[in-house]
């Protein structure tokens, strides 16, 4: 299938599955444990039904908006995805260029294949950088400094990866640093000639932000030992304060999927949060993000900008997220499929599909401005939204109390005697009417 035949993100996924080696395709297209949350993320979007409106002027539509003050052509950004450069040679550079040309933010992962400096050299506009807080805080501070030097305009701090969840496909595929491919995966590589040729033509085949920037980490073998020991289980809200002291730009907190955590994040003064469950790759059994969005919006929507990721596969999904209160969204797998399918052109195709689907959905819902989309566009929102947004019934108005009757004035004695006599006569007549007729005795 060629790009001109592609009609949705799932078509790009099919092409990527054919072109990308199994161990790297499975890395992107998998979840933790039973993958229940991974599946729920997309299923929850499908359960939301929209109101179809007709006979409304839907000319001159606009899907452009802003994210933390940055103009964007559609309400989405490319999410940080580790090892993007293994989906396609120099993958981060291809994705960043596509995002820049399309007018949406690109977020580079700490665990990228291409380094911060390489992506900055290949692009002309600021991109965003995602940070994992490592045990080696000196290295974390160095990463922040490098992001500043590269002109990154926002820092995305990931909070939900203090410890790595088990992803069965990665274990079975031997995906590690260095990789330990199985015989089956080696055979699979033989059937991916275009990918193999492309990887031979680039020098970027390791974690570019780490190798050569950490003392003692000079190759894939030493990288594996260092990486396994660096994810920090002690990361807490005080650590976020530490990050803020080192980063004086826009700060986005990623991985919030609980109301109480959202409240804490808002109090810390971050510019935005991303309602996220890491695409179902961390806590299997966690709630779908679109289900958690309404109560989080209700709790802190007036205090902080709210974005959402996990489960978005179409422009209609973006529309539903906006209708439920998100300012914007992040896409991960949706752009990774495009990247694996056709590099920069594939990412551009993914963004074009999302924009077209978003625009058509908005039009058929009777709206012309994405910034005006809201709860009024939903017919059957998630149960969590119904609890939050449905107006509470007003208490029924009580009937006005009747005024107490004033006590009657005392009647003179003569009047009393006449009244008593009249009552006595009336009683006799009533008794006479009620007296049954006499019956004859049966023989």
Stretches with model-predicted labels:
Residues 92, 286-289, 347:
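Short, conserved glycine- and acidic-residue-centered signature motifs
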Residues 392-443:
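Intrinsically disordered, polybasic Lys/Arg-rich low-complexity tracts
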Residues 1-69, 174, 178-235, 372-392:
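An N-cap/entry alpha-helix motif that binds or orients negatively charged groups
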Residues 49, 64-66, 75-79, 105-109, ...:
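Short, conserved beta-strand segments within well-ordered enzyme catalytic domains
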Residues 83, 97, 118, 122, ...:
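Alpha/beta enzyme core
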Residues 101-122, 126-140:
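A gly/proline- and charged-residue-enriched helix-loop-helix capping module
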Residues 1-46, 291-309, 313-398:
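Alpha/beta catalytic cores of nucleotide-metabolism and tRNA/nucleoside-modifying enzymes
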Residues 72-111, 116:
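Glycine-rich active-site/cofactor-binding loop and its immediate structural neighborhood
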């Amino acid at each position: 299938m060629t790009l001109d035949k592609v009609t949705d993100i799932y078509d790009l996924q099919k092409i990527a599955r054919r072109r990308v080696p199994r161990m790297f395709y499975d890395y992107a297209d998998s979840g933790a444990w039973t993958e229940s949350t991974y599946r729920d993320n997309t299923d929850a979007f499908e359960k939301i039904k929209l109101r179809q409106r007709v006979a409304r002027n839907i000319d001159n539509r606009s899907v452009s908006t802003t994210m933390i003050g940055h103009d964007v052509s559609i309400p989405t950004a490319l999410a940080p995805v580790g090892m993007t450069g293994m989906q396609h040679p120099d993958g981060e550079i291809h994705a960043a260029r596509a995002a820049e040309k399309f007018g949406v933010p690109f977020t580079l992962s700490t665990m990228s294949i291409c380094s911060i400096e390489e992506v900055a050299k290949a692009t002309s506009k600021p991109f965003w950088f995602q940070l994992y807080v490592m045990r080696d805080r000196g290295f974390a501070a160095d990463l922040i400094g490098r992001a500043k030097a590269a002109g990154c305009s926002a820092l995305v701090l990931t909070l939900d990866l203090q410890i790595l969840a088990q992803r069965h496909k990665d274990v079975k595929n031997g995906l590690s640093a260095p990789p330990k491919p199985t015989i089956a995966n080696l055979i699979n590589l033989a059937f991916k000639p275009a990918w193999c040729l492309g990887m031979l033509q680039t020098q970027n085949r390791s974690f570019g932000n780490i190798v050569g920037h950490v003392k003692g980490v000079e190759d894939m073998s030493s990288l594996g030992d260092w990486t396994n020991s660096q994810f920090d289980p002690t990361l807490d809200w005080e650590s976020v304060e530490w990050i803020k002291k080192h980063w004086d730009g826009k700060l986005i907190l990623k991985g919030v999927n609980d109301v109480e955590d959202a409240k804490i994040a808002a109090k810390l003064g971050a510019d935005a949060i991303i309602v996220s469950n890491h695409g179902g790759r961390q806590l299997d059994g966690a709630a779908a993000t679109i289900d958690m969005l309404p109560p989080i919006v209700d709790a802190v929507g007036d205090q902080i900008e709210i974005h959402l990721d996990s489960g978005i596969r179409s422009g209609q999904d973006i529309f539903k997220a906006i209708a439920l209160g998100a300012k914007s969204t992040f896409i991960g797998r949706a752009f990774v499929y495009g990247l694996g399918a056709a590099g920069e052109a594939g990412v551009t195709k993914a963004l074009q599909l999302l924009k077209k689907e978003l625009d058509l959905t908005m039009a058929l819902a009777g709206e012309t401005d994405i910034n005006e989309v809201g709860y009024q566009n939903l017919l059957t929102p998630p149960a969590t939204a119904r609890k939050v947004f449905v107006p509470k019934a007003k208490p029924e108005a009580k009937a006005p109390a009747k005024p107490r009757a004033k006590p009657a004035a005392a009647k003179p004695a003569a009047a009393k005697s006449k009244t008593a006599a009249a009552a006595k006569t009336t009683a006799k007549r009533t008794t006479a009417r009620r007296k049954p007729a006499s019956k004859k005795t049966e023989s």
